[in-house]
Structure formats: structure tokens, C-alpha cells
Amino acid sequence: MRLRVRKASQQRSATPSARTVKTKRKHSEVEHSLSTEDAKMQKRDTGIFSTIKRFIRGNAVKVEQCTPAKRSRVDCDSDSNLITSTPTGGNLPSRANPKTRRKGPVNGDTMTGQNKPVKPNGKLEVQAETPSSPPRTTLLGTIFSPVFSFFSPANKNATAGSDSPGQAVEAEEIVKQLDMEQLEETPTSTTTDGRDLTFDPALNPRPLPHIDTTVEEGEIVTEADMPPLTAVGSNSNYPDVPPSPPAEGTYEEDWEVFDPYFFIKHVPPLTEEQLTRKPALPLKTRSTPEFSLVLDLDETLVHCSLNELEDAALTFPVLFQDVIYQVYVRLRPFFREFLERMSQIYEIILFTASKKVYADKLLNILDPKKQLVRHRLFREHCVCVQGNYIKDLNILGRDLSKTVIIDNSPQAFAYQLSNGIPIESWFVDKNDNELLKLVPFLEKLVELNEDVRPYIRERFRLHDLLPPD
């Protein structure tokens, strides 16, 4: 009985399992047929069956995948005013700036997203800029020394700390440099071993001329009092020709736009914070000369341009705001002889309102071992007064009674007028000898070993050129 019951139970249990398998198979076949019918019904969107089906089952909810829109870069062309302080206005005609080549966006600056066509020689063909492109630099963003501007009437009573970059005016020459030709491929290395430099052998320092000079009455320097002056490798003497102040008749012609002495007269006083600035130079050593000579760079010792100069003594690349510029340099006549002689009796300090990226590299080329110029100060060491850079000599940390500054812009030493010696701006004159004219006077100041300010004031009389109250 038990065996039969077990067999019967096994047979009974087998039947429903078989039915279940058949049911599952039929169900899968039905699903397959339904899916096939669904596919066919989806193909034909019209008909009574599709209508009934949609009515019974309902419309399937389509889940749309939220995919972000395809990114596209804004075609914002490059601004050509990368070294000038005056941005191009929107109403000016657009033009290409073929002498710039980009390396990549810096500090969030936008660049064109389109691939720039490459010429067969490997140079980039820069597209014409649009007037709506935003300016990438401020009005003070030049690599060369900017031109001074008058104080606005609303800010005449402002202090020296109230600087306004909007009042800085760029030099006309720098603005002209926007019309640049195609930039030649130049290495981006900043080494000073001469591989990036191009020297003109015809422009080597010439020997000093032997000039018979006469001593004017009333000078503190006489030929008999002067020691023999010979530059290294030269047997010629410097002439003792005093620099003459500009004549009143031609003064207005030279300064049609800007009067440096009117600027000096109305310059605001230094703030307490500026007066207590930490000295930028290290303390003197035993080998340091007792007297300090501060020299300007642009138009005082050299003349630099972004336009190609055929008579350039050297040329070198400068990377400024992601753009490589080729700088062409002219050296003022007797530039090296002057430095070689003065460095023996003065602590030579270069103080320029130019950008460090340009001035420091130029000095590395001209004086790589710092044998002539002991210290270098740049724009960041100047005092910015309403957009104008003034060289406050207090930042040197030196005794001002034994400090002399030579600059082609008298307003640059507006706060220490009695320490300043003006010199004529130099651009191209090969017969210039203004540096030679200053040598006897500078040597005499060291020989006297007294306060230099009364002698400078008596010799150049810059205070007499200030406008009356």
C-alpha cells in the first residue's frame, strides 16, 4: 500500500509539474508573440488594434535621458593690447595681431576655441579680432616704463596712496608698436648664455674720444682737480662738459603735453605707510662703495622697442601674459664705459618703472655677473600716485646725503628733487655723449665726501624750474 501510494503521489506530482512547464512554455510563447505583435504594432502607428492596445495598456511613459548640451567654446578673439595700457575701443576697426602667438589660457582668460590654421612654415595664422573682445590688461599693464599723466582736478588733494590705474597714459611709441609684423619663431628659454641673443658685431663699444674741453667759470669741477679717467681698455679721457638746462624757449615745445615740473609741484606727499616701507636692498658690506648712484633704464641707458630695429645691438624674447615678444635693444653711446668707471666709486643701483620680466632679463644679458650693477629695483618698488610711478629713494635704505639718481624723467624723483640729475632722453643719436658729460661732476662729488644735495641743487637748479605758487 505504501509503495503504491508513493508511486501514485509521484505520478500525481509529476503531472502538475509537466503542466507547469507547459504553462510556462505557453506563457513565454505568448510573451514572445505579444512582443512580436508589439513590435509590429509599433511599426504601424495607425489602425484599430493599436488604438485598442493603447486604450487597454495605456501609453508607455517615455523616459528621456537628460544629457547635457554639447559644449562649445565661445569664439572670443585675442586682444592685441597685451603690453599697452590703452585698450582698443569697440568702435575701432578690427585687425589681426600677427606678431603674437598663444601658448594657452592663463588666469581664466578666454581664447578662441577654433583651431587656428597652421601655415606651411609652422606658424600660426591668427584670425582677425572682434571689437567686442574684452581687454586682458589694465591700464598699467605695460612692460616698458609708462608715461606720466597729470593729476585729475578732482583728485588734486589726494594722497600718494590713492592711485588710480585709469589715469595712466601709455607712451605713444608703445601704442605704435601694435602695428607689428609676423613674429618669428623664438625660443622661450630665459637663459642668458647668449643662445637666444643676436648681437651686431658692428655695434661694439667704441673707444672714448679725446676731446679738449674748457672749464666754464663757476663750476665746481676743474680739469686740474679731476683724476685721469680711463675706461677699461681705453686710454681716452672723459670731457668735462657740463649739461646745460633746457632753454625756456624750447621747453614748451619739448613738453607740449606733460610738464614734469608742474607735476612735481603738485605731487601729493607720501603717506605714513609709504614713509615706513621696509628697505628693498640688503645692508652694505665693507666692499660696497660709500656713495650710491641710482640709474634709470629706458631712454637713459638703453632704448628698447618691439618694432624691428636694424641697428639694434641685441635682441631677445620676452614672455609676457602668455605671449612672446621680441625686444630690440639699442645701447646708449658710452653706456658700458660709463658703468665700468662709475661702478668703481659708486654702488650702482638700477631703478626702473618697467616690468621685471623685461628689465631683469635685459640686465642679465648686459651684466650677467652683476659686476657693474649691484642691485635692481623694478616697477613694484615704485610708489604709484594716481597711476603714475614715482621712485621714492627711501626704499633703498641708503643715506640720501650720499645718494644720486640719474633719470631722463625728472618727475620720477619728484620726492627727492635735490638728489636728482636730469639727462636728455636718448633714442637713436649715435653722437650722443650725455653720459660722458656727467662723469666729472659725479667723480667730484665722491672726492668732496660731503652731502651731495647742495651741489646737485646748485648745479642743475631744478627747483628754479618749478612753477610759482
Curated annotation (Swiss-Prot):
EC numbers, comma separated: 3.1.3.-
Organism, scientific name: Danio rerio (Zebrafish)
Biased composition (Polar residues): 10-20, 79-91
Function: Probable phosphatase.
Protein name (record): CTD small phosphatase-like protein 2-A
Biased composition (Basic and acidic residues): 28-42
Gene3D superfamilies hit by this protein: HAD superfamily/HAD-like
Family: Belongs to the CTDSPL2 family.
Pfam families in the record: NIF
Region entry Disordered, spans: 1-42, 73-136, 181-209, 231-250
Domain of life: Eukaryota
Alphabetical keyword list: Hydrolase, Protein phosphatase
Residue stretches making up the FCP1 homology domain: 286-445
UniProt-recorded Gene Ontology molecular function terms: phosphoprotein phosphatase activity
